């Protein structure tokens, strides 16, 4: 196998892994929907089920549940993952961006179409950097939050004070 064939082989594996990750997210979503079934609600703890019957470690199960929350907010990202066009690492990066955005989540989500498109062409680390920059750009407030925090503080952290 030459390098071109190895690269094609790895790309095929990546696509299959993305589709498997999407199926795990689908199973997680189904477990959650079973809990909220109005006819026959079933008590299910998705993490436990994923560990006991999905063959995952506790950490991997938590990651699946976390990714499920991300794809619930951004179903477009789940769709490209199911198509095999992006990876679970890209979904994780988007989740970190949502955490950074915090209260400015809606402003961050206005950039979602561009981010989803970028996730199909960028590496996970490049995409992570783009997501962080995008999230920080929507929460930037020209120092107003820093000023508000400083007004509430009851002590001085650094600097000289001159009392007259």
Question: PLM features: what roles do these ranges have?
Answer:
Residues 1-164:
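Conserved C-terminal region and hinge/linker of Rieske [2Fe-2S] proteins, especially
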């Amino acid at each position: 196998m030459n390098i071109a064939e190895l690269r094609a082989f790895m790309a095929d594996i990546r696509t299959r892994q993305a589709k498997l990750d999407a199926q795990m997210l689908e199973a997680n979503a189904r477990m959650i929907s079973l809990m909220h079934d109005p006819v026959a609600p079933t008590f299910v703890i998705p993490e436990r089920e994923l560990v006991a019957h999905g063959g995952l470690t506790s950490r991997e199960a938590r990651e699946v549940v976390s990714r499920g929350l991300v794809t619930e907010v951004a179903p477009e990202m789940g769709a490209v993952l199911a198509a095999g066009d992006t990876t679970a690492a890209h979904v994780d990066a988007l989740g970190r961006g949502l955490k950074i955005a915090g209260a400015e989540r809606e402003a961050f989500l206005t950039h979602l179409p561009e981010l989803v498109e970028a996730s199909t062409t960028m590496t996970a680390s490049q995409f992570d950097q783009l997501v962080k920059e995008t999230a920080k750009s929507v929460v930037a407030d020209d120092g107003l939050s820093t000023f508000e925090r400083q007004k509430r503080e009851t002590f001085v952290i650094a600097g000289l004070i001159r009392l007259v």
